[in-house]
Amino acid sequence: MTLVGLFEARDKIMTILKNRPSALSKDEFMHQFAGVYEHSDWVAELLWDQIQVSIESECFDTVDAISAQMKGIVDTANYDLKLALLRAHPDLAGKAALAGELTDDSTSEQAGVGLDQLSEDEFQRFQHINDSYKAKFEFPFIMAVKGATKIQIFDGFESRIDNTVDAEFNRAVNEVHKIAGFRLADK
């Protein structure tokens, strides 16, 4: 790695969020981070608690640190909390999107890959696959769609529908972490 590369890597690692999380009030913190994990404020609440008891609270002021801590909170949560986290996610190109009921983040993510501009046939295909997936796994198909194409999303559905429930549960949690990472990077 070159010296320039080392400085770039250091700068990335040391990226300070717009408002230092360790210096925010609880209300400010929740406003900024509650939506990182879709409709799962408990993740940000637990992170806030960790920051408050930390001797070195400024260690939580980088994107990488916040991301790692939030991921750790989710990974150590019990099964029921993780299942609720998965079920908090909307269907891709689903009825909530049509009704305008998505969070701003989900709306932006789905629109960014054209899921708001599907043909009637594509929409029906998404509905069928969403329904089949939920019938088998009891949570919605979750994929970090940023940068993906509709074809890649359809392929993701098709390649994952044959997974075991345990394998797909773990895959879905990992996709949620990717989504959270994208959301944090945008802060």
Describe each model-derived feature in a short phrase.
Residues W42-V43, V145:
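Conserved phosphate/anionic-ligand binding catalytic regions in large, soluble enzymes, centered on
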Residues P21-K26, E38-H39, F60-A65, Y133-A135, ...:
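Short acidic alpha-helix initiation/capping motifs at coil-to-helix transition points
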Residues L118-K187:
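C-terminal non-catalytic interaction appendages of large macromolecular assemblies
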Residues L6, V43-I129, I179-K187:
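Aromatic-anchored, charged helix-turn/loop surface patch used as a conserved interaction hotspot
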Residues S40, L47, F141:
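Residue-level signal for inorganic ion chemistry
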